[in-house]
Amino acid sequence: MSRVVLVTGGARGIGLACARAFVGAGDRVAVTYRSAPPSGTDAADLFCVSCDVTDAGQVDAAFDAVEAELGPVEVLVANAGITADMLVLRMDDAAFATVVDTNLAGGFRTAKRAVQKMMRARWGRIIFISSVVGATGQAGQANYAASKAGLVGLSRSLAREFASRNITVNVVAPGPITTEMTASLSEDRRTAITEAVPLGRFGTPEEVAETVRFLASDAAAFITGAVVPVDGGLGMGPS
């Protein structure tokens, strides 16, 4: 059955891979972007909407546009996120708050808007994209790790709150994934991360996307409140 899917932060990386996976499955897919929409073949069959998830008004407007074009959102992939890495002693309140406002509060805003129509339909899927560092922590990423850890508490609270309406809420926690965000890593840092991953490599956006697509499917109807790692075993910690 074709569903209406909205992927926030869907212009590149994991978000775009999720959007393309849903399009490939025959779904009607919208993506939000903050700076530039996907282009060329990446944008094929996607409805693209500008949206800053830190602005509740823009979130409402994006959902209104998607609903007018495709219909009510049935699957939400809350992926929009940013980083602002630095050591805590150099991190001011704004650097902490901006990341949390985007990654955590942005997820709250989009999920709150999505469940309004999902409740009426008595069906819905919400998948938050977190990170392995939400569980393990990472030096220089206190803001990012806190925001990603917060998504777990948010998702499990929503999972309990809306279970009676047949709305499932889950988290996917990627490890190191080959994206534009990781492309800037130095070769030494990249090697160190690879050596820490039991499977010995970075993952791909498509591997994350397939996990997300499964959680949105009828096959995952009895899964809610879960945190699914796609991290090559990194989250297990050192052996």
Tell me what each language-model feature is.
Residues 131:
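Residue(s) in the substrate-gating loop at a strand-loop-helix junction
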